[in-house]
Curated annotation (Swiss-Prot):
Location of region: Disordered: 595-625
Transmembrane residue ranges: 49-69, 107-127, 154-174, 192-212, 246-263, 328-348, 369-389, 406-426, 429-449, 465-485
One Pfam family it belongs to: Xan_ur_permease
Highest rank taxon of the organism: Eukaryota
Organism: Schizosaccharomyces pombe (strain 972 / ATCC 24843)
Single GO term (MF): purine nucleobase transmembrane transporter activity
Cellular location(s): Golgi apparatus membrane
UniProt signal peptide: none
UniProt GO BP: adenine import across plasma membrane; adenine transport; guanine import across plasma membrane; guanine transport
Family according to the record: Belongs to the nucleobase:cation symporter-2 (NCS2) (TC 2.A.40) family. Azg-like subfamily.
Full protein name: Putative xanthine/uracil permease C887.17
Entry GO terms, CC: Golgi apparatus; Golgi membrane; plasma membrane
Membrane topology (UniProt): Multi-pass membrane protein
Keyword DNA repair among record annotations: no
Length: 625
């Protein structure tokens, strides 16, 4: 037997041991004995899938800091024209310090949120400050160098409050209900619109490749000029497409990454970013990010430390707690709406991809816990100075690699924790290294357009409006609002005409319309809330979890340890009978308690009712907390 085969056999044996342990039953690994064990899930496969997800989303450490630093953060500037602040050496150095804080903060909150999402919600997703949400935070709410309607400190407070509001909405089940009641085509259009939004950011000169620039006559124009020919308003004074940084980012960060992705290379995104970054580190290079200037020297001195744990100096608990005026309320409401749509769409898509969605209720396992973890992560992230935290669409790479449980999320969290000690490296990643990444991520998010119902204009037009207005208004919120208003207007008018004409005047393709109703199956309140109201003292326990524990106890009672010759020793008939009698008594007591609180539906009936077509998993809506 070869060494490879021996290692493979050892891994398989270890997977079986882990699956049969309490750890395996908690995460519902295949072979654990849980009624809703997740088919195909193995411990070793979850570890590999977690690493794949981290490599796919590790770019957020650089990209999130690059986007949020444009707000200016807590740096002070008294210039009337905030664009002139970038000409002040003290302000520029302050922003560089702010950028380093953001790298540490992003790693910290990503580690905490991903680990908790995996441990408590058992969801195979990675968490981090969301792309699109951070752009909205930076460019729509706070503005470049603080030119927006709300200051950076006030925006952090809005995010902090938003998280607690989300927690309340989750407890009463309203957040899950909103996720299920949104028309399907608008859900898919939201992801595509955010993809186009990210694409524009990736092509821009401030946070990307610089392929496009400003034009006073045409709004946007061709860019790509060297830094010495780039005007303050990001328009080019000639020499378009002659920037070495842009071409390095396109070929090394874009073309190479795309080819690696076509070959299903794990970590393709990270490889492209790493290549462009390493190319930009030599100081004598034409594309260096450490030119011999005041800022370049300052950055290079920090970069030379390589390994260093950096404390968060400027943005830790930076909220402005005494706020007045309507602009804060507008920012809070907008964050609520935008984040609930973004998180809902992403988390639902990942749960569906992993086969965890119940096709009848359109809810997924652990939805209540997942939304609560997300909500608390949003508030904690604001204390670290970050924009709202959300589930990452790149989690799909880990799911496609076989990830099905929360072990994937825990691995992602551990990897982000390790990255905390390499802040000088991660804070020295240039924007042209991540610009192509944003474009590629945007292209992947456009895949959701294939799921839009293009057969009926009442569904397709609102979806298209949503997609188009997000990048063209440079606002996710405006696109979502326009899409929902358009959907309600068109379909309400058609519905009224249909009723008034008694069904004689209907569109030719009306039978192609997606079914929609506000009455979602499964009700509004989560199952654990219902058990609480019915007087169940152990309302937090899922009945299937109790049954799994009973089965595990029975299995341990009917087996003994292996003897030296490798054969199992059988237990006596009296021991087995006594154990089975005890377990039957425990089960009868549990059933009587369930009947007392009005839960008469048996497990077998629920198992027959909930069949998911995605991964062959018998499951029910799970709202464990």
């Amino acid at each position: 037997m070869s060494i490879t085969q021996k290692v493979r056999n050892w891994v398989e044996e270890f997977d079986v041991i882990v699956a049969r342990s309490a750890f395996g039953r908690w995460f519902r690994l295949e072979g654990c004995g849980h009624p809703r064990e997740r088919k195909g899930s193995r411990f070793s496969l979850e570890i590999s899938a977690g690493l794949t997800t981290f490599f796919a989303m590790a770019y957020i450490l650089a990209v999130n800091a690059t986007i949020l630093v444009d707000t200016g953060g807590t740096c002070e500037c008294t210039e009337a024209n905030r664009d002139d602040c970038d000409k002040l050496d003290d302000y520029v150095l302050c922003k560089e310090d702010f950028h380093r804080d953001l790298v540490t903060a992003t790693a910290a909150i990503s580690a905490l949120a991903s680990f908790c999402m995996g441990l408590f919600a058992n969801m195979p997703v990675g968490m981090a400050p969301g792309m699109g949400l951070n752009a909205y935070f930076a460019y729509q709410v706070v503005g470049y160098n603080g030119t927006g309607r709300v200051s950076y400190r006030e925006a952090l407070l809005a995010v902090f409050v938003e998280g607690f509001i989300f927690t309340g909405l989750t407890v009463i089940g309203l957040r899950q209900w909103l996720a299920r009641v949104i028309p399907a085509s608008l859900k898919f259009a939201t992801g595509a619109g955010i993809g186009l939004y990210l694409t524009i950011i990736g092509l821009s000169p401030s946070a990307g490749l610089g392929v496009i620039g400003h034009s006073s006559s045409d709004i946007v124009a061709l860019g790509g000029c060297p830094p010495e020919y780039l005007n303050a308003d990001y328009s080019c004074n000639g020499h378009q497409l002659q920037s070495g940084r842009m071409w390095v980012g396109i070929f090394c960060g874009g073309v190479l990454t795309a080819i690696l992705m076509m070959y299903k290379f794990k970590g393709a995104v990270l490889a492209g970013i790493a290549l462009v970054t390493i190319t930009s580190w030599p100081r004598r290079s034409l594309v260096t990010m450490f030119p011999h200037t005041l800022t370049g020297d300052y950055n290079f001195d920090f970069f030379k430390k390589v390994v260093s744990f950096r404390k968060i100096n400027r943005i830790l608990v930076a909220q402005q707690w005494n706020v007045t005026g309507g602009q804060f309320a507008i920012a809070l409401i907008t964050f609520l709406y935008v984040d609930i749509m973004d998180m809902t769409g992403t988390l639902y898509s990942m749960a569906n991809y992993a086969g965890l969605v119940d096709p009848r209720t359109q809810d997924f396992e652990g939805s209540a816990v997942a939304y609560i973890v997300d909500a608390l992560s949003i508030s904690i992230g604001s204390l670290f100075g970050c924009s709202p935290v959300t589930a990452f669409i790149e989690s799909g790479s880990g799911i496609s690699a076989g990830g099905r449980t929360g072990i994937l999320g825990m691995v992602v969290g551990i990897c982000f924790f390790i990255s905390l000690f390499f802040a000088p490296i991660f804070s020295s990643i240039p924007v042209w290294a991540t610009g192509s990444t944003l474009v590629l991520v945007g292209s992947m998010m456009m895949k959701s357009t294939t799921l839009i119902n293009w057969s009926y204009l009442g569904d397709s037009i609102p979806a298209f409006i949503t997609i188009a207005l997000m990048p063209f208004t440079y606002s996710i919120a405006y696109g979502l609002i326009a899409g929902i208003i358009c959907y309600a207007l068109l379909n309400s008018i058609i519905y009224a005409i249909d009723k008034m004409s008694r069904g004689r005047l209907v569109p030719a393709d009306y039978n192609q319309k997606e079914a929609w109703t506000w009455r979602v199956e499964g009700g509004l309140l989560p199952q654990w809330v219902r058990r609480l109201f019915k007087g169940n003292r152990r309302f937090w326990e899922d009945p299937d979890d109790r049954k799994a524990m009973d089965n595990a106890t029975l299995e341990m009672a009917t087996s003994r340890s292996y003897s030296e010759d490798g054969k199992n020793e059988k237990t006596t008939h009296e021991d087995v009978t006594m154990k089975e009698t005890s377990l039957k008594k425990m089960d009868d007591e549990r059933i009587s308690v369930d009947e007392a609180v009005g839960e008469s539906e048996s497990f077998s009936n629920r198992q027959q009712d909930f069949r998911t077509p995605y991964a062959g998993i018998d499951m029910d809506t799970d709202d464990r907390i």
